[in-house]
Amino acid sequence: MPRMTDQAMKPIHVIGGGMAGSEATWQLVSQGVPVILHEMRGVKGTDAHHTDGLAELVCSNSFRSDDHRTNAVGLLHEEMRRLDSIILRQGDAARLPAGGALAVDRDVFSQAVTKELSEHPLVTISREEIPALPPEDWDSVIIATGPLTSESLSEAILKETGEGELAFFDAIAPVVYRDSVNTEKAWFQSRYDKGDTDAERKAYLNCPMDRDQYEAFIDALIAAEKTEFKEWEANTPYFDGCLPIEVMAERGRETLRHGPMKPVGLTNPHNPTVKPWAIVQLRQDNALGTLFNLVGFQTKMKYGAQGEVLRMIPGLEEARFARLGGIHRNTFLNSPKLLDAQLRLKSQPRLRFAGQLIGVEGYVESAAMGLLAGRYAAAERLGASLTPPPATTALGALIGHVTGGHLISGKGSFQPMNVNFGLFPPIEQPTVDADGNRIKGKAKTPARKAAMSARALSDLADWQAG
């Protein structure tokens, strides 16, 4: 790392003391770069937080699976540990019994992160709201204000980025792994064969239903257990534009087949003489073509119910879900359009964004983006450059998705994403295990994931060494 200059000693401002902001702060000061961390809690609260502690966990106390061999979020844990993440280090220290998951004592965890950062000689914590974009003399800023970004700052970001580039609700449709769809029942075709290329004319996977299947599906949708909006979500005025599929079903049994499930402009090559009563369409969700989302299927069904109901769709009986659906109060940017590969706002490169605000979902994913934002900003301040982590790593796959790997297909197409193996470049399927035995059947999937994880950690080590 180059010798620190006077410019390097100028502090970097981090706005937001949640998971991403706390991690970004730690990564910066670990490189010798001073930080002013701005956190409004303690002066102004939010509708969901209960304390003024840094890295407060407002929902679950789980960081999800800690299995780094066959689980993508577990792999992300391991990568972050190897990069000296304060969130993972203090998470491990506050660990509770949770089987293969990493669950933490939320109070112990938040208090430990707060103590470590507040006592660090290079950290200044400023308890104040930043109600607008930072002043021009703040030449390097990381904005990590999360899903409950204050109204005034949200308005300032909206003004800078343009109408429609900042969302206030996510409307998440379920996403399935392409290789788990039964193409003996489903087929590729765009409505009315629209498109200039063969790929465009076959851009959608179509799952047909006859009348009995459709009626049973509607019954299941209406009967399924739903999650209720929290009071602070229900009172947010941006919800009307993204109705859950079950609400559409409740408004009329024919509503869906005249909406997202309309069976027009499509012919089933498996049964061309029979017109489907309804059709569920899946659209490619990432550039690799490994993930497909269910078009128009944002939902408030509980996760367990989603699996049961959605596997009633012909062709999805054995579907594996990379992401289940949901609708939540959220604030996030259209990052693939607005941010560069180093998380800088293209229109104002002095501003970096991190955490849920850039369109990742989950505590660990948010902290991971804070980790990268902090490292990028530190390198820049110190006159160095930092190449992005390889796309084969969990960190690289996730940042690649939010800054360019997602396919932009119209307003609202970019929605928050958890880390999952569908974001990674494919790998050749292992054929034998460590003992030389042939890998068969259900053992193939964990073997492929283990190979992806091994590749990721090897490539991460090379990136660190470089």
UniProtKB/Swiss-Prot annotation:
Record field: catalytic activity: uridine(54) in tRNA + (6R)-5,10-methylene-5,6,7,8-tetrahydrofolate + NADH + H(+) = 5-methyluridine(54) in tRNA + (6S)-5,6,7,8-tetrahydrofolate + NAD(+); uridine(54) in tRNA + (6R)-5,10-methylene-5,6,7,8-tetrahydrofolate + NADPH + H(+) = 5-methyluridine(54) in tRNA + (6S)-5,6,7,8-tetrahydrofolate + NADP(+)
PANTHER family, per the entry: GLUCOSE INHIBITED DIVISION PROTEIN A (PTHR11806), METHYLENETETRAHYDROFOLATE--TRNA-(URACIL-5-)-METHYLTRANSFERASE TRMFO (PTHR11806:SF2)
Requisite cofactors: FAD
Gene Ontology terms, MF aspect: flavin adenine dinucleotide binding; tRNA (uracil(54)-C5)-methyltransferase activity, 5,10-methylenetetrahydrofolate-dependent
Species, as recorded: Maricaulis maris (strain MCS10)
Protein name per UniProt: Methylenetetrahydrofolate--tRNA-(uracil-5-)-methyltransferase TrmFO
EC number: 2.1.1.74
Presence of keyword Ribosomal protein: no
GO biological process: tRNA methylation; tRNA wobble uridine modification
Domain of life of the native organism: Bacteria
PROSITE patterns: GIDA_2
Gene Ontology CC terms: cytosol
InterPro entries: FAD/NAD-bd_sf, MnmG-rel, MnmG-rel_CS, MnmG_N, TrmFO
